[in-house]
């Protein structure tokens, strides 16, 4: 159970672009957790576990394989086969990217966020994949190409399931600062394309068979029953992204998992993160 999260010192802190020789560009979140069972065993004494989440820039020498694994988790086993994950990991490592680690900069990231410039990479395998997903994306990309003064970022982000959502606001703020530095003159992207996933809470599969139905034909015995009464989010921030999305659509559920695609403008992205941060403060 998360008891305390120290984020105040992160809100206005900017990560340095170049690490100092004897330092790093890391920011820390100190999370204290308790185990209620241990509390009872220790007569009410809390056992406190402190975890420091350190924020780093993408490191091609260390992060490549871990990013591929996180991308495979993001897209799922089926969609991952349609994407050149190695090429996409290279794009991420060549773009404004923030990773979160717990064992120093040489360790594997538990989380990442990246903003890949669309126009600079519009011929990439990943863009070609997105164009085939839905006509709305293909049309939007054409509009961006034809527009001389508008641009968008391909937002890619994933984290291990036990990463707390409290890391998300500083993660976005730090990376958006890096985007402004990369674009120059404190600029930002006009639009952001976010790919994420949701899941069916009550997804279930049952064989329509029992001992009294064994004489029915094989087709009837092999039928599956799917219940999808409720859909929920893997990532808490996606609730807010959907709220402010200019375009939002989803794929059909596959084994209880739904791919979700959103296009937000800059104002919508910032509002989403601000509202998420406000929501977290009430927990």
UniProtKB/Swiss-Prot annotation:
GO terms for molecular function: protein folding chaperone. GO terms for biological process: protein export from nucleus; ribosomal large subunit export from nucleus. The modification Phosphothreonine is found at residues 205, 209. Residues 12-44 are annotated as: Disordered. Keywords: Cytoplasm, Nucleus, Phosphoprotein, Protein transport, Transport. Residues 20-29 have a biased composition (Acidic residues). Its main location: cytoplasm. One of its GO terms (cellular component) is cytoplasm. Phosphorylated by the PHO85-PCL1 kinase complex. Present with 4590 molecules/cell in log phase SD medium. Involved in nuclear export of the lipid kinase MSS4 and of the 60S ribosomal subunit. May also play a role in directing MSS4 to the plasma membrane. Plays a role in actin cytoskeleton organization and vesicular transport. This is Protein BCP1. It comes from Saccharomyces cerevisiae (strain ATCC 204508 / S288c) (Baker's yeast). The lineage of its organism: Eukaryota, Fungi, Dikarya, Ascomycota, Saccharomycotina.
